[in-house]
UniProtKB/Swiss-Prot annotation:
GO terms for cellular component: cytoplasm. Mn(2+) 2 binds at E298, N300. This is Carbamoyl phosphate synthase large chain. The keyword Metal-binding applies. Large subunit of the glutamine-dependent carbamoyl phosphate synthetase (CPSase). CPSase catalyzes the formation of carbamoyl phosphate from the ammonia moiety of glutamine, carbonate, and phosphate donated by ATP, constituting the first step of 2 biosynthetic pathways, one leading to arginine and/or urea and the other to pyrimidine nucleotides. Residues 930-1058 form the MGS-like domain.
Amino acid sequence: MPKRKDIQKIMVIGSGPIIIGQAAEFDYAGTQACLALKEEGYKVILVNSNPATIMTDKEIADKVYIEPLTLEFVNRIIRKERPDAILPTLGGQTGLNMAMALSKAGILDDLEIELLGTKLSAIDQAEDRDLFKQLMQELDQPIPESTIVKTVDEAVTFARDIGYPVIVRPAFTLGGTGGGICSSEEELCEITENGLKLSPVTQCLIERSIAGFKEIEYEVMRDSADNALVVCNMENFDPVGIHTGDSIVFAPTQTLSDIENQMLRDASLKIIRALKIEGGCNVQLALDPYSFKYYVIEVNPRVSRSSALASKATGYPIAKLAAKIAVGLTLDEMINPITGTTYAMFEPALDYVVAKIPRFPFDKFEHGERQLGTQMKATGEVMAIGRNLEESLLKACRSLEIGVCHNEMTSLSNISDEELVTKVIKAQDDRLFYLSEAIRRGYSIEELESLTKIDLFFLDKLLHIVEIEQELQMHVDHLESLKKAKRYGFSDQKIAEIWQKDESDIRAMRHSHSLYPVYKMVDTCAAEFDAKTPYFYSTYELENESVQSNKESILVLGSGPIRIGQGVEFDYATVHSVKAIQKAGYEAIIMNSNPETVSTDFSVSDKLYFEPLTFEDVMNVIDLEQPKGVIVQFGGQTAINLAQALSEAGVTILGTQVEDLDRAEDRDLFEKALKELGIPQPQGQTATNEEEALEAAKKIGFPVLVRPSYVLGGRAMEIVENKEDLIEYIRTAVKASPEHPILVDSYIFGKECEVDAISEGKSVLIPGIMEHIERAGVHSGDSMAVYPPQQLSKQIQETIAEYTKRLAIGLNCIGMMNVQFVIKNEQVYVIEVNPRASRTVPFLSKVTGIPMAQIATKLILGQTLKDLGYEDGLYPQSQLVHIKAPVFSFTKLAQVDSLLGPEMKSTGEVMGSDTSLEKALYKAFEANNSHLSEFGQIVFTIADDSKAEALSLARRFKAIGYQIMATQGTAAYFAEQGLSACLVGKIGDAANDIPTLVRHGHVQAIVNTVGIKRTADKDGQMIRSSAIEQGVPLFTALDTAKAMLTVLESRCFNIEAI
């Protein structure tokens, strides 16, 4: 069927900020979809609140709106643009929920706007637990016994009838939010109450638990002519009971017989046809390992995380084709872009194994609840491709960047057998490593299968890896053993460990016997047809399919999996760098391991290597491609950490040189450079042991800021107020980076701001200064940032620009640089310098219109700022005010304290832009879901050192009609100062303590600060947790509360009696 001519203008709804459960895969899907629709000649209007994405770049759509994804703002944009149709299926759960809201509000009918891709009825049938159950019964598809509840009592009654364990699944939520497995009535009451609150339709499904069944996923596509196909089938290593986003996944399925595969395939196609979905859809099924019995778990009637994985695993561009299907094209008339000859109707065939392992944030959140269940906790994921399961699994392990090069954690060798068995039974984020340790200790795979319900096939593969380790131990320097180990994915580093040699010795031995990896192409058709795509993975076989081109090439290193501190912003910079390399006439090669991102879309670069970002894997690609040089400054700390080893191996690092990277990272060298350049910094010293640290703190004076050197995202950074706390920090936290000393700095509580600069070593372009709303002490990634600055004098701004220029030239910066400053008593101090792209690059690029990563790349390749038409110094400011606000995922992470501090905790960001600060702030708060009522009750529970400042805020809240409530100490202080506050009870006073008031909806906001020492007491943490659980705005920094107050005051009228 030809594409539709009756629609011209299509609105695409993005997925908003990155949170756990909805990450960069939607940037990838949305970007593909917008470009596909433009390719077909439609006018595309995009709305999304996330500035860190490629999707929100001007050239991706005809018009891009970076506005809050709320009914209020989307409605305004629709009325302004009058699109003929809306495509909501590429914006994750956010997009679907927005489509439902627009429909319920009557806006779609009122303006005669059509929904493309998935009908509202299909969204309802797949997402509404009751309708889904009815549809499955009509189709004769088995689902676990279940009931829909609207109250906790209904849930309890059902569970008493069918027995425990049961699973709770709230309707219309994302990543299993609010759900869980319940083994007792107490757990059921707690989880159901929370689930009903989080479900926008106050509805939960309570179903019999089928934990222990195999979990299988089918990624299917259908068009308007009812053609349907399976793009990819995937099997979870972990059985049912763990969210698929938190499971290790293999594609294609590994343990199914042909009969089982056909049975589940038929079920999936039957379901997508019944739902009449036009586009992509994900079906999750549970299969009894001992019979042909199966259940349908759920259906996602949209592009999902699994579709991004399926796209990258097969090379089949699901989102691109889903967008074209939505406008009427059919699978049998679209060419598969990978082969360029076959049609999209061909089901992909795989002649390799793909492994996906989730990346969890528990290196950041040591106290987080690591137990995995039906609610997702991973922030990102890695993918690896190999010719056998062992190879793909081991490549994925070393892609995780958690300090392992193999499925082994050396620290586990010290734990007792008893603890080991407990960890194997309890599914936590690191269970793979405990399973492997158990096999090394001689536990049989049959024992492990009965404890974990993980299929024997997978456990046998782990056993095989251990057997190869043993073979290596017995045959040191044996060539055949080396060949075998390499064929099954062992790294040089692991082999070196076993043979007690250096990694370089193994590399030399391989080279002396011409043992190099070859690169195979991902071609969707198991080499049946010629493929046109330059998308490769390494393996140790005979035939190499990747040929070095005649053109000079440049290798760009990506940033690996998304984690807190290193998000999609670095992928944004990578993609822009590649564009600039191509424009300059070079071949651009990307190397990355993250299946969710735009950078690993094979159409972005001239060549894509889907490989771990380790020294060995990068060197193998360099040996083959012989690039002119490697660019490391866009891949976050991942790529920067490889620079030294690559440089020592004779590789040309383009841009800022390794010794200059070192000068910015190494404390003593940096201090020396600042002295030479005449730039002040907070007093500080380096310490390599406890004695030196105490000596330094004594000399500088408490409070001090302590942190390890060479870290990203404020990992293990703390503000310490006395000697005892400092000793405790050194003994517990410095594990973060053992080879490097710790830094002890004077802690200055002043205004923070940061600058991104671009230089070629002679002149420096400063696109803009971003002023932080929160004062020093809150990590820059968790602060709200304002551009242009609202409270910095012209003189301060000039000083900042001058220091930035001196730093860029003094540190021989070629490309990008980020500098953070703190200002106290009109004195500007430099806190830190990062000689690489930072997380603010996308935001600043969007608000200034300067394509920063592209310009930086052109400078790296030898052009000057003058050549590109830019002048030295600070770029003229924009007329609008722009706010970048952080977004957190605390609802997904039990036991992680939401108190903000020097360690980064946010997972994403949103942007608000308008003509005034108040309007921009309002948009930013709306976009990050901090919606505050115009009036109500606000609770203050404040540390002694900030009570005076909190008092003036409380007075202002009272003036606009809020009722002030406070805890005992705070209320007493307010009363002394003449402000009466309603006293709330101590934690445990069941009737009126804060958690109880919050639970019953009596509190509209909480302001809670702790002293500089920051030791969060149990009560404070309970208060903060209750706010997070119930979705009540929580402010742990007075500056954020002040910003919110500014918005409320600007929206209030003055009402006074005459």
